[in-house]
Curated annotation (Swiss-Prot):
Methylated by PrmC. Methylation increases the termination efficiency of RF1. GO terms for cellular component: cytoplasm. One of its GO terms (molecular function) is translation release factor activity, codon specific. Belongs to the prokaryotic/mitochondrial release factor family. This is Peptide chain release factor 1. The lineage of its organism: Bacteria, Pseudomonadati, Pseudomonadota, Betaproteobacteria, Burkholderiales. Peptide chain release factor 1 directs the termination of translation in response to the peptide chain termination codons UAG and UAA. The modification N5-methylglutamine is found at Q235. Disulfide bonds: none annotated. It comes from Burkholderia thailandensis (strain ATCC 700388 / DSM 13276 / CCUG 48851 / CIP 106301 / E264). The gene is prfA.
Length: 360
């Protein structure tokens, strides 16, 4: 283990002891905000310090085994102990290196998932509905909460555009790699000749701002229009102007919400989505310079980048960023995303490790 890494782990061990002391004080537990902040930090570094304690124990076992090597009668036993200790040290050091990787500050946040139909007309809108169901089924498996924020249904089913809010611990860390272009190859229900069509949708996964105030929005920069909510085919749902359209003039970002009968609730939802979109735009602009110097295969989140193909006749899903093909399309479309997400997270961690190595 590198000296710099060991020094960092020693600092975290000291910090954990400080946190244990602070969290036992009444004045700290009385301040809810401070208590929440400290418990979050404790939860983050606790597993790292525990791993480091195991590594130090393995190193102590290694030293003890080396001393036993001098005794001829204990040599076979000592060699087995030495080999086992070194294997544990190597495994724990690799795991610690991954645990010390820079954390994305948005990882534990709730998210907004925005799905837009692209090329392919009605078939693209139907596939947008299939993607929404896939994410909702995954959220259900994680016991996350889902709230419909905005929807624009298509005439034949599916969606021209749909936005949902998914609330759950670590939602962004699990689904952030879904941003990009999703292509589908299948025979549409309306196809009489049995020909395979190709269509596409774009997905944007945006972390929710903790508070709308976290993103600076000048009320003077907003244009808010109200109109009558309508469903698929244009039929009016109610007689009042309950639907809300919010335009952020400096960026040109437009958000519409009409799912609730209350204009106030629709406006509140629209402002939340707007804050997330502005935050997302700032995040990608900030990382554009880094992307220019170091091509990030996984985490770019570029909406125009085709990241995945779903081939229904062959029952396969291919993620083009990591050249991963899985022949379990039915399960994937039913929300079984764990294998795919684990592969993407692993590749992203490998990229981070490589970039840290280059920096050193």
């Amino acid at each position: 283990m590198k000296t710099s890494m060991q020094s960092k782990l020693d600092q975290l061990t000291t910090r954990l002891a400080e946190l244990n002391d602070l969290l036992s004080r009444e004045n700290v537990t009385a301040d809810l905000d401070q208590y929440r902040k400290l418990t979050r930090e404790h939860a983050e570094i606790g597993p790292v310090v525990e791993h480091y304690a195991q590594w130090r124990q393995a190193r102590a076992d290694e030293l003890a085994a080396q001393e036993l090597l001098a005794d001829a009668s204990m040599r076979d036993f000592a060699e087995d102990e030495l080999r086992g200790a070194r294997e544990r040290m190597s495994r724990l050091a690799a795991e610690l290196q991954t645990m010390l990787l820079p954390k994305d500050p948005n990882d534990e946040r709730n998210i907004f998932v925005e799905i837009r139909a692209g090329t392919g007309g009605d078939e693209s809108a139907l596939f947008a509905g299939d993607l929404l169901r896939m994410y909702l089924r995954y959220a259900e498996r994680q016991r996350w909460q889902v709230e419909m924020m905005s929807e624009s249904p298509s005439d034949l089913g599916g969606y021209k555009e749909v936005i949902v809010r998914i609330a759950g611990y670590g939602a962004y860390s699990r689904l952030k790699f879904e941003s990009g272009g999703h292509r589908v190859q299948r025979v549409p229900a309306t196809e009489t000749q049995g020909r395979i069509h190709t269509s596409a949708c774009t997905v944007a996964v945006m972390p929710e701002a903790d508070e709308i105030g976290e993103v600076e929005i000048n009320p003077a920069d907003l244009r808010i229009d109200t109109f009558r909510a309508s469903g698929a085919g244009g039929q009016h749902i109610n007689k009042t102007d309950s639907a809300v359209r919010v335009t952020h003039i400096p960026t040109g970002i437009v958000v519409e919400c009409q799912d609730d009968r209350s204009q106030h609730k629709n406006k509140d939802r629209a402002l939340k989505v707007l804050a997330a979109r502005i935050k997302d735009k700032q995040y990608h602009e900030q990382h554009a310079k880094e992307a220019a110097t170091r091509k990030s295969l996984i985490g770019s989140g570029d909406r125009s980048e085709r990241i995945r193909t779903y081939n229904f006749p062959q029952g396969r899903m291919t993620d083009h960023r990591i050249n991963l093909t899985l022949y379990k399309l039915e399960q994937i479309m039913d929300g079984d995303l764990d294998e795919l997400i684990a592969a993407l997270v692993s590749e992203h961690q490998a990229e981070l490790l490589a970039s840290l190595g280059d920096a050193e």
